[in-house]
Structure formats: C-alpha cells, structure tokens
Amino acid sequence: MASAEVFKANVEAVTRDYICEPRIEYRTVGGVSGPLVVVELVKRPKFAEIVNIRLGNGTSRRGQVLEVDGNRAVVQVFEGTSGIDNRNTTLQFTGEVLSTPVSKDMLGRVFNGSGKPIDGGPTVLAEAYLDIQGSSINPSERTYPEEMSQTGVSTIDVMNSIARGQKIPLFSAAGLPHNDIAAQICRQAGLVRQKAQDSMIDAGREEEEFAIVFAAMGVNMETAHYFKQDFEENGSMEKTVLFLNLANDPTIERIITPRIALTTAEYLAYECGKHVLVILTDMSSYADALREVSAAREEVPGRRGYPGYMYTDLATIYERAGRIEGRKGSITQLPILTMPNDDITHPIPDLTGYITEGQIYVDRQLHNIQIYPPINVLPTLSRLMKSAIGEGMTRKDHSEVSNQLYDNYAIGKDVAAMKAVVGEEALSSEDLLYLEFLDKFERKFVNQGHYEARTIFDSLDLAWTLLRLFPKELLRRITAKTLEKMYERSES
C-alpha cells in the first residue's frame, strides 16, 4: 500500500466515531390487538425498523414498527401474536429495515411468504441483502415498454399483447380457473425476437434471459401443491422462484410476501439482466390482510372497510414493474385478483384498474360453456399493446387483425342478443355470418388446451382462418394492401 493511502487510512481510523448504542431488551408490552403489539417506554424507536421478539417458551419471531408516538411503538408481528404476554416476552429493536437475501441461486427454489426455503434444500447463499420496499427509481430513467412478452395464449398475445415492463392484472372470481391460467402462463411465457432478413420467428423461451417470480398469498395446501408439482413436471421450475404464503400462515405475512418477491425480481432483472415475469396471486388476500391491520390499528375505514390508503399501498407494489435506462432486464407484472361476488366495481379491482395498464377479464359465462381459458376480450384491455407489436416486433398485420377480431366479435355478440328477441328466421345472411364467426371464435380461437402453447404467429394464422369466413368487403378494419397479401380463401 502506498504511503499516502496508509496515511489516509490512519487519519480515518483516528477521526472515525466508534460510539455505538447497545441493543436494549424490553419487557414493556403494553397490549396486543390482532397482529399488533404495543410496546411502551422504548428509547428512540424508528419507523419501519425490525424488532426481534422472544417469547417465554424460547421461540423467536420478527416484527416491524408500524407507528411511533414518542416512546411508544406499535409493532406488527409477521408470525402472529399468539402466545405473546407482558411478563416473559422480550423485544429488541434492531434499528434496521426489513431486508431479504437475494441470489441468482434462488431460481428453481421454493420459499415461504417470509422468504425462507421450504423445499428441503440448503439456505441460499446471499449475494446481496436488499430492502424489501425497493429502491427509488428516477422517473426520467424509466424506459417505455416496447417489446412483447409472449404468453402462448391467443386471446392475450393477439388481442391484448403484453409489453415487457408492463403491469396488467387478471380480474377473476371465485370458482374460475385463474390458477390454471397462471400456471399455463408460467409454463409458456417467453420472448419473441426478430430473425435475419426481416422475418420473425418464435424465440422459443430463451432460458438464459427469461425468469419467473411467482408469489401466492393466502392459497390452500392443494393449490400450493398444484403449482409446485406443475412447475416441476414441465421443467419450468428451473427458471422460477416460488413464494408460497398458505391460508393457515399468519395473515400479516401476506403484507411482505409480494414485496419480497418483487425485490427478488428487481435483483434478477437489474443486476442479472433477466426479463422477469412476476405473477402475484391472490391480491384480494393481500388487500384483506391490509384491512385486518388497519382495523387492528383502529384507523378510520374507507369503502367496505378497506383503509383509505389502499390505493397508495397497492401502487407501491404495482409501480415496481418496468424497465430502467442502461439496464438489460425488465419486470413485467401479472397480478391476479378475485373479484368478490363478481363485482368489478369492488374497491380492489377498481383501484387496481386505476394504477395498472389495462386488465385481463376472466368471464364466468364462457367458463360455464366449457371454454378455457375463459377470457372475455371485450372488457379486456392492454394500454401498451400498440408499442409492443407490429413490423420488427411481431408481424405487420398484427394490429389490423386484432382490430378486426374485436369488431366482428362485438357485432356477433349484438346479433346473438338480437336473435334471442326476434328469432333466427328474422336475421339476414350477413347476421348469420357473424353468428357463425362468434361460435367459431369462442370454440377455436379463445378455447385452447391447458398444455397447448401457441406462438404469436400460430395465433395470427388462426385468426386469419376465422376472418376468411367473411368477404373482403366486410373486413373494414384491414387495409386493402394487407388483404391483398394475406387474404386467400381455401378452395376446400
């Protein structure tokens, strides 16, 4: 070491402040309310700091400071407050925020809602410890999402394409196959790239660049086993990080599960250069946990008992999707929520729709006629689709085909409603053509197998097969140039 460096190190050693404060153990539990513990006479408590809790029987738990009032602190306990008393329970305020270990080795592993391994494997060797609230991102450094992430589901890829870095929720309801759809997207999700000479091919899921972070909140044991077994059997587990918060796990743990999952996704995306798809299910369970904490704190409730700050809280999760200038990776979010009583005006889907960039709507009527996946394309929307498709990204005719499918399907729905009133005999030949399209669209285009992965180009070709039911004059959303190139009636 050079003499100048030695001198500088000595100066720093002499001038460094070595004063530290020892951690104090408190036995001043003032009360317990639901998942919250009130601690009295705390010396300089800090908001959001981690608290180590030791019960009288020797078991340890962790909590986080939610509220500070002078020397009084309100702590939410992640593992629940059962067994905590004011005699034998000791608390230690660490002065640190809640962080989680992250590593590339987390791919292929299963963790609980607190980020601890539950697959019987070894503890992950951390490459970094990151705050679960995430790093603040300068809005000017965000990059507009402009590349498509392929799901293998025709109704999504063709009519509601998802851009890398987009946040788009899946609105479902009790009894609908949203878990099956989520598992299928995990199996089939991949990238689309351009081949030489301006022709497009399917990238076939570039394993080294694509990853999935799956966080389940409030699911039962059967659902958790289904996801785990499905990923392991089809080989997608190698590129998946699985976080499972079960229904019998502490409710309060659901508050941190999506944040731990997103922190892991941020590390994989911005440090490892991967394109990460984050699937969060069920956000309704998360919102219910938020309501439980709010009620325990005796806060003034908002709509249907949910806290008034739920919009802001949901935004802290959804807004962590995106791309950053100078970083190769991206985070695409697909949160899944079940609408209570199929009510899309419920506060959870209502506020989610304000924050996110569209929605995918799972329809009960389609499910009742055995259509899978039962995605209703009419209330479904992807606001960033226009920037993720077209020549050089998918195919030049993509936008026109999508618009024409929407137009014909909407007219077909109107004709079906009119048929129920006036009867089929009163319909014109053109109306009957739209009815035929309506049936074939739902049976052939919307409907596909659980393990049927269609590339975007297969789906576009299938769409053209349906559009050829109509004469060119009725395909008003497609330009004459595109019709001349793509419209070829089969002689059969």
From Swiss-Prot:
InterPro entries: ATP-synt_VA_C (IPR055190), ATPase_F1/V1/A1_a/bsu_N (IPR004100), ATPase_F1/V1/A1_a/bsu_nucl-bd (IPR000194), ATPase_V1-cplx_bsu (IPR005723), P-loop_NTPase (IPR027417), V-ATPase_su_B/beta (IPR022879). Coiled coil: none annotated. It comes from Acetabularia acetabulum (Mermaid's wine glass). Transmembrane segments: none annotated. Pfam families: ATP-synt_ab, ATP-synt_ab_N, ATP-synt_VA_C. GO terms for cellular component: proton-transporting V-type ATPase, V1 domain. V-ATPase is a heteromultimeric enzyme composed of a peripheral catalytic V1 complex (main components: subunits A, B, C, D, E, and F) attached to an integral membrane V0 proton pore complex (main component: the proteolipid protein). This is V-type proton ATPase subunit B 2. Belongs to the ATPase alpha/beta chains family. Non-catalytic subunit of the peripheral V1 complex of vacuolar ATPase. V-ATPase is responsible for acidifying a variety of intracellular compartments in eukaryotic cells.
